[in-house]
């Protein structure tokens, strides 16, 4: 519901605490939790590049994160009727490597630098308050942060109690 309102522009950066190095014309990534994490980051980078709207990519990311593996990525794509071949081509080719490098540059350019993941930035800022609020109730955080006319979906977040008549 929130994505269709236009009050949120969400970006996911599946890079985490990885480190990159260059070997020839290729980038090599070492992920904090090993090769499987790097594999899933690469799959997610390709999916995010190919599916531009959160209503398209969020169901895939959610599905993949339930069981992060290449075989589950293919299953998720099938379940969600997403063509696997372009993702596979990206994943296995130079495009995926380039996308991961771009994610590294964006992650490393964060100010302040990220200290953990997930690292939440709202309106170009990161604070502990933003982090805590967004992680505990993203809908409420977005609705409270948005300065324009609040959409209907935000009205339900303002009521914490419902008293008897």
Spans of features found by a protein language model:
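Structural alpha/beta surface segment adjacent to cysteine/selenocysteine redox centers
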Residues: 1-88, 156-165
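C-terminal cap of thioredoxin/glutaredoxin-like
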Residues: 63, 67-165
């Amino acid at each position: 519901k929130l994505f269709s309102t236009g009050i949120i522009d969400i970006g996911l950066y599946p890079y985490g605490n990885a480190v990159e190095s260059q070997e020839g014309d290729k980038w090599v990534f070492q992920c904090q939790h090993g090769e499987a994490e790097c594999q899933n980051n690469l799959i997610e980078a390709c999916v995010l590049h190919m599916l531009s709207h959160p209503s398209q990519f969020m169901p895939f990311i959610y599905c993949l994160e339930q069981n992060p593996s290449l075989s589950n990525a293919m299953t998720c794509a099938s379940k969600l009727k997403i063509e696997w071949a372009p993702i596979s081509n990206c994943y296995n080719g130079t495009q995926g490597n380039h996308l991961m490098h771009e994610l590294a540059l964006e992650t490393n350019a964060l100010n302040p630098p990220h200290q953990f993941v997930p690292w939440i930035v709202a309106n170009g800022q990161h604070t502990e308050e933003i982090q805590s609020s967004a992680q505990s109730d993203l809908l409420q955080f977005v609705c409270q942060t948005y300065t324009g006319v609040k959409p209907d979906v935000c009205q339900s977040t303002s009521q914490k109690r419902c008293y008897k008549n």
